[in-house]
Amino acid sequence: IHNLWLHPLAKFPGPKLRGAFYFPAYYEIAKGDVVYKQHELHERFGDIVRIAPNTLSIIKPEAWKDVYGQGHKAPMPKCPEFYWRGASVAADIIAADDSDHTRIRRLLNYAFSEQALKSQEQIINSYITLLISQLSKQASAGSAVDVMAYLNFATFDITGDLSFDESFGALEAETHNQWVATLFSMLRAGAIIRILAAYGVPTEKIFEYIPVLARARDAHDDYTKEKAGRRLEKKTDRKDFISYVLKYNDERGMTHDEIKATSGTLILAGSETSATFLSGAVYYLLKNPDWMRKLQEEIRTTFTTESEITFASVSKLKMLHAIIMETFRIYPPVPAALPRISPKSGVIVAGTYVPAGIKIGIPQYCAYRSSRHFLNPEKYAPERFLGDPKYVEDKRSVIQPFSVGPRNCIGQNLAWAEIRTILARLVWNFDMQLQDVSRNWEKGQTSFVLWSKPSLMVKLHKRNVVA
């Protein structure tokens, strides 16, 4: 009764059952279909919906600066049960509180700057070349290939090298090592951990009650510490992430334990999201062959050799940019909300007062597929980013795949360079055919913060072109 009629959120729209009880929301989190259910609620109830007794979901474009940016004076802290830490007590860039985050980010900004990216281009391109080589072998064999798996191999190898000065060897072996496989299993386990933590179960108790989770967590932490520790002992001029941290480190900088903890976070955040995006881009292009032909024409007429495809040159391609933006819209790599807590003073979010202590977040999947924001939201239509007057009323400012504010994605420069270049070189090298088994690849994917994806089976045909 209190939750329905006396709670500070009682006036907000949403189903009565959700206003009274937590279990509908937590059940969806456990199942992995939370973004689909929330999308239905937003279509029914509007831009602000009460999805649980103490939780609001909001999809207004102007909410980004209020929830995640600096649209108000009072800070919006991260929801603690969502951003639980592993066994390490050291801060990492995602789970750190605001003061630790500012200190850590100050150093990592050097590692992810445009200048650093230029020095890392050769390293990154070497892995893209290996990706193309391995896919070319598959094309010659004439069998269909799981493109999603190879994109994962490439992005993990790139991020591993840039983090530890060591590749994971996934592209060479054409399989992930056990540590990366453990990372994927921890994503789903994280949903259960967050639910139990929300009900007041301490994180360490959760691991105590579920030993298999504790073993996976400890294996992840141990492997990260070993890799990062080996890198910290190296004397090298190679321009990886840690080289910049060490160069600019001081008494206000990062401890070695914090470097190790943050390295593990960067591996997952910098690899899985890019691979997910690229898989989505390939899928939607193959489902919409007219757009694939337009992209092929742009890339294959702009460049005369593959060596001309560089970070700088691909950044100027208008068709490629439109396709990337539409892919972000229809298939965001991070579809679910990353919740914050409203401050003690309460806060105005997109013109609406939110009381103190309320969980609030913006689910990208719901915001980007809203019929209030986009014409034909379920249609893959890159022309909405090419000036088509039909889509002039689209609220494109709601699309923020890297978030906003002081805690936005620090690796977005790298991500942009990586996805542009990999996609351009794939289209330069191969004609592709989506296999029937993957005809509805996006349907029914579950989400545990990131997407849980099936194989993306594609037949590749190598073009006979100059390298």
Q: Which role does the model predict for each range below?
A:
Residues I1-R103, K118, N125-Q134, A154, ...:
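N-terminal membrane-proximal hinge/A-helix region immediately C-terminal to the signal-anchor transmembrane segment
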Residues T273-L286, I422:
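Short, small-residue alpha-helix embedded
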